[in-house]
């Protein structure tokens, strides 16, 4: 760290204020620890944030105190940070865009614990280039159901000839992401995702549901497809989650889901770099895929009718 509590990065000088502030009280993790994590993870993480509107999960007083969700860019953000103005109900909102390491470090200094990017990019925010399925268990002890559901989805996506990537949520669930060609709108994508998720629910309605209300889930695993909407987000790959231990949402290989010691909160800011030192990022080639929902739609209808 440079003197005067500033980090020199990307030709920028980012001041770190209150570096000793405890952000994770049960673990003694400080703001500087979070800043250092995001600075080190930036080469892996920034490619998954580039040119996407961001929603920030901020805990300036630590996760032991109430945090807040920030969509609009604060007026004091420096001019060198990229922003994008998008439509919202009744007007517009200007989001931050994280296209470089310095921006990520700056956001960490703002007490930003979690970063949640849109599923679309700034060049056309109305046409998503990612489709997401969020496997969210009702209970802490249903890892087998979460993994099983994700593997069923992978099998179905293979039949649809759609590429699929998976990551931990850093909590109890899994995110399955399909990279798209950004030619369809959000309504079309969400309808596709819902129809596909219904195939899994129809196979085992005692274990999986599309019902978002917890009291109606009756202990079942939610396959959340409602994130596939305009302005909806999910935790970014390598984002810290605001939970004790500072777990991280981590891309994993499909075969890893079957390992005995696997769990969605396995990786934290303390051990993720040991993993990356010996394992390639399973998502590193995601950008090479641009799948077509239009081409897959007839196969999906046949699959659902079977």
Predicted regions and their residues:
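A short beta-strand motif that forms the metal-chelation/ATP-contact edge
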Residues: 175-181, 221-225
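Flexible loop/turn segments at secondary-structure boundaries
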Residues: 63-66, 76, 141, 173-175, ...
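Beta-sheet entry/capping signal
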Residues: 13, 53-55, 66, 163, ...
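Signature for HUH/AEP ssDNA processing cores
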Residues: 96-169, 180-188, 305-306
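Polyanion/phosphate-binding surface patch
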Residues: 52-83
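Short beta-strand
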Residues: 57-59, 164-170, 211-215
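C-terminal accessory nucleic-acid interaction domains of nucleic acid-metabolism proteins
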Residues: 1-29, 33-35, 46, 50-51, ...
């Amino acid at each position: 760290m440079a003197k005067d509590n500033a980090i020199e990065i990307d030709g920028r000088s980012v001041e770190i204020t209150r570096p000793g502030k405890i952000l994770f009280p049960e673990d003694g993790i400080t703001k500087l620890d979070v800043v250092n994590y995001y600075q080190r993870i930036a080469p892996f993480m920034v490619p998954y944030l580039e040119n996407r509107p961001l929603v920030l999960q901020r805990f300036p007083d630590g996760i032991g105190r109430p945090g807040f969700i920030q969509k609009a860019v604060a007026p004091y953000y420096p001019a060198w940070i990229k922003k994008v103005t998008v439509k919202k109900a009744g007007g517009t909102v200007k989001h931050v865009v994280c296209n470089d390491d310095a921006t990520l470090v700056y956001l960490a200094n703002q007490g930003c614990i979690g970063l949640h990017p849109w599923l679309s990019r700034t060049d056309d925010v109305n046409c998503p280039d990612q489709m997401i399925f969020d496997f969210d268990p009702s209970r802490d002890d249903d890892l087998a159901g979460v993994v099983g559901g994700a593997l069923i989805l992978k099998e179905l996506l293979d039949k649809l000839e759609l590429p699929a990537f998976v990551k931990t949520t850093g909590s109890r669930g899994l995110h399955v992401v399909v990279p798209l060609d950004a030619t369809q709108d959000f309504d079309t994508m969400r309808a596709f995702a819902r129809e596909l998720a219904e195939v899994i629910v129809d196979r085992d309605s005692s274990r999986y549901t599309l019902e978002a209300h917890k009291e109606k889930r009756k202990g079942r695993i939610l396959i959340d497809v409602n994130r596939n909407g305009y302005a909806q987000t999910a935790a970014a790959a390598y984002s810290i989650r605001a939970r004790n231990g500072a777990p991280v949402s981590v891309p994993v290989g499909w075969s890893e889901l079957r390992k005995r010691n696997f769990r969605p909160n396995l990786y934290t800011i303390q051990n993720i770099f040991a993993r990356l030192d010996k394992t390639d990022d399973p998502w590193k080639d995601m950008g090479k895929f641009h799948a077509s929902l239009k081409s897959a739609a007839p196969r999906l209808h046949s699959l659902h009718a079977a």
